């Protein structure tokens, strides 16, 4: 797939030879079972309200030990323990840890090769999207008619909450996880990430949180919705403990991954790769993780405090006892709105990366693209309170936050103009990744324009909490973000898998899902404008036709995505063998062989031109390769 798999497996590895996903699951189960038993004896297994603190302590301890056991069983702590004991890692150990010559087995192990980690992220993301999509179908089925009720109100809210947080996790990692890991190190001329073990650690932390999150189904669910507002969170069943632990683990994973990516790009770029020669996708990934590094710890802090309230009787969020639930709302949205751009920026950057390839002309105003990305990052941390207009918190700040929210349309508009300017008079090569750009632009316009309206206090007062808001953020996160990720999959598929993507089958899936998407959320715009609220399953007959339309559209999305996933599997297993550079692209990942060697380059490259010089006579098609020491410059 990505590296040569023939030849003897290295003799090194030590205990790592016996650790894999199976041992991780076994150790996690044993640790969790022991923790549950001991914690139950200490704090009680009672289910009544009089034992709520003890019950939550039991589950949080159980989930914590599950995660520790899982990470122990996968081998995440072997390296640190060896370092503490003063044992150096041999070359054979390093090669084994990188997955050399281990075939498919390396995808089920703690493997440090950034290409393997990228593929692991891709598979995990697809599984999360499938689970989240199934939950979405259950939600829309419940809403198809005012007389249809497959859930009770509490279960409906729990399903909505679980769907929301699964999809948020999936969309956050859908581009930076697979392609930030697989592509970025090659794209900047590096042999691997700066911290390969931390790279693998970030991935397996994500895997460890999936069972914790899904356990909420059996613990009363997440009836608060994905935002888990207080005091609802403190009153929720033990499924809320699953939510708390999921967010804590995810924040740790995101911080580790973000620091690793930023360090890699800053310190390991190839000689000659100045910032003006650095591909725009690299900028997008760095901006995304750079925004996540300060944003997600605030989310983590909000959940730590919530966990303390649930397990020790503190009242940080209990207004009646002297706490303040606005504290939670501020901490949550300090993460919640930057998180939108953590998702959106790398998806748009991926499309800006390959757009010049398919129009055979340079990216229009590279500097404007960089400034637009930087502007979004800067303003995204100054708009969080537009989610709080209706809460009564600091009403004197409504106007300033309305202004900053409207201002963020300026840098996003700059990115839109970069797309349009690049398309202008280009010689379009109408392959499926290119056509996805048109779909994204349509969705991006709708998501952006509806967002401008919602930024105004009077409009927000009328539409806040309605299906209109649901449609708006789906047009942004799914219509632009997910479509960008699908385009990235189609574009880099030949390099990741060594095979061409089946554009016929994949095209059917893509366009069916796009038709369904617009039908679904146009219907939601309509019922939202008419007044249908979010977060409740019962509604007036006034909204029934719109919900029938939206549900039919949702089924269409699901069918289209299943076809698209089938195209991925079919192409991966039996697709046409790809050449090293089927698109005729100039960036470094397309200049190395397919499958990509373990260390990416036999000799490290020296960059002599920008990556978008299509149609420029003096622009060289390939970088100069010269044997130099590993490393780069800041």
Which residues are covered by each model-predicted region?
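Membrane-embedded and interfacial regions of multi-pass energy-transducing membrane proteins
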Residues: 2-634
């Amino acid at each position: 797939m990505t590296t040569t798999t023939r030849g003897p497996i290295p003799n090194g590895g030590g205990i790592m030879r016996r650790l894999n996903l199976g041992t991780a699951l076994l150790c996690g189960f044993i640790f969790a079972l022991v923790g549950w038993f001991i914690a139950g004896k200490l704090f009680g297994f009672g289910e009544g309200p009089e034992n709520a603190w003890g019950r939550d302590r039991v589950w949080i301890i159980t989930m914590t030990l599950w995660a520790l056991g899982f990470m122990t069983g996968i081998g995440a702590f072997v390296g640190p323990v060896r370092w503490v004991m003063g044992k150096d890692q041999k070359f054979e150990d390093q090669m084994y840890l990188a997955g050399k010559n281990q075939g498919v087995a390396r995808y089920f192990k703690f493997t440090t090769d950034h290409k393997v980690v990228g593929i692991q992220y891709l598979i995990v993301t697809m599984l999360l999207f499938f689970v989240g999509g199934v939950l979405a179908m259950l939600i829309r089925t419940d809403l198809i008619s005012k007389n249809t009720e497959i859930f009770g109100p509490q279960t409906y809210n729990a399903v909505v909450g679980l769907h929301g947080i699964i999809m948020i996790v999936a969309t956050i990692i859908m581009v930076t996880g697979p392609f930030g890991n697989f592509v970025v190190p090659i794209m900047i001329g590096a042999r691997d990430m700066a911290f390969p073990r931390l790279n693998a650690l970030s991935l397996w932390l994500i895997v460890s949180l999936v069972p914790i999150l899904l356990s909420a189904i059996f613990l009363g669910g997440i009836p608060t919705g994905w935002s888990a507002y207080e005091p609802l969170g403190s009153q929720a069943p033990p499924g809320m403990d699953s939510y708390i632990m999921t967010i804590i683990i995810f924040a740790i994973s995101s911080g580790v991954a973000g620091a690793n990516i930023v360090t890699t790009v800053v310190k390991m770029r190839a000689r000659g790769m100045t910032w003006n020669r650095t591909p725009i996708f690299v900028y997008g990934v760095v901006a995304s993780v750079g925004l996540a590094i300060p944003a997600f710890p605030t989310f983590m802090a909000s959940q730590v405090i919530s966990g303390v309230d649930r397990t020790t009787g503190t009242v940080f969020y209990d207004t009646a006892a002297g706490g303040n639930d606005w504290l939670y709302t501020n901490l949550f949205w300090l993460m919640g709105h930057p998180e939108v751009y953590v998702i959106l920026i790398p998806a748009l950057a991926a499309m800006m990366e390959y757009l010049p390839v398919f129009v055979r002309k340079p990216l229009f105003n590279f500097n404007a693209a960089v400034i637009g990305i930087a502007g979004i990052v800067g303003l995204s941390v100054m708009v969080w309170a537009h989610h709080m207009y209706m809460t009564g918190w600091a009403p004197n700040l409504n106007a300033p936050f309305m202004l900053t929210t409207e201002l963020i349309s300026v840098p996003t508009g700059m990115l839109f103009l970069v797309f349009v300017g690049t398309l202008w008079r280009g010689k379009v090569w109408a392959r499926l990744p290119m056509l996805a750009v048109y779909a994204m632009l349509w969705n991006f316009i709708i998501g952006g324009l509806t967002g401008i309206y919602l930024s105004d206090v009077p409009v927000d007062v009328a539409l806040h909490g309605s299906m209109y808001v649901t449609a708006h953020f789906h047009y942004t996160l799914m219509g632009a973000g997910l479509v960008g990720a699908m385009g990235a999959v189609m574009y880099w598929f030949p390099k990741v898998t060594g095979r061409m993507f089946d554009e016929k089958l994949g095209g059917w899936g893509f366009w069916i899902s796009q038709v369904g998407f617009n039908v679904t959320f146009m219907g939601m715009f309509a019922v939202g404008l008419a007044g249908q609220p979010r977060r409740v399953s019962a509604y007036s007959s006034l909204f029934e036709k719109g919900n029938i339309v939206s549900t039919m559209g949702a089924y269409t999305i699901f069918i289209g995505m299943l076809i698209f996933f089938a195209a991925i599997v079919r192409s991966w297993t039996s697709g046409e063998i790809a050449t090293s550079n089927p698109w005729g692209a100039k960036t470094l990942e397309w200049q190395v062989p397919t499958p990509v060697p373990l260390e990416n380059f036999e000799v490290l490259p020296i960059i002599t031109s920008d990556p978008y010089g299509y149609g420029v006579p003096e622009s060289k098609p390939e970088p100069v390769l010269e044997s130099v020491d590993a490393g780069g410059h800041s």
